[in-house]
Amino acid sequence: MKTLTIDFETYYDKQYSLSKLTTEAYIRDDQFEVIGVAVKQSGGETQWFSGTKQKTKEFLNSFDWGNSLAIAHNAMFDMAILSWHFDIKPKMIADTLSMSRAIHSVEVGGSLKALCSYYHLGAKGDEVINALGKRRIDFDDDSLARY
């Protein structure tokens, strides 16, 4: 079975964020906006896309979600966006956040930054932190590429 690893980056600010709202309230809010999405198919290269909601839907529909295992860190978030905003439902889902919590409990931490450090997978950048309060239109091409 093919795997599709996915990671959405979305708009947030000091008052509108996952630390202030439930996942559902955040994703269903009128302020919600996808900045971009990264998808990696099986062993291939990661593809990063940023565009309008319609163009993002077209990009996402280019993958065979119905016959693939979708992998995400905090899959509840990414799969809810995939389903509620783009009407895409993968055949199977794997959540690396749940896996890491089951394996490491609180010893390592569940953040991507902590897990990357623990498994020597390189450093997670601070692009997401620097995106506070920025809409997709606020990014230049270079900033989006670094995201």
Question: Which sequence ranges carry the predicted segments?
Answer:
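Entry/capping segment at the start of metal-dependent catalytic domains
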Residues: 1-32
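Active-site-proximal helix-loop-helix substrate-binding element of RNase H-like nuclease domains
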Residues: 32-39, 43-147
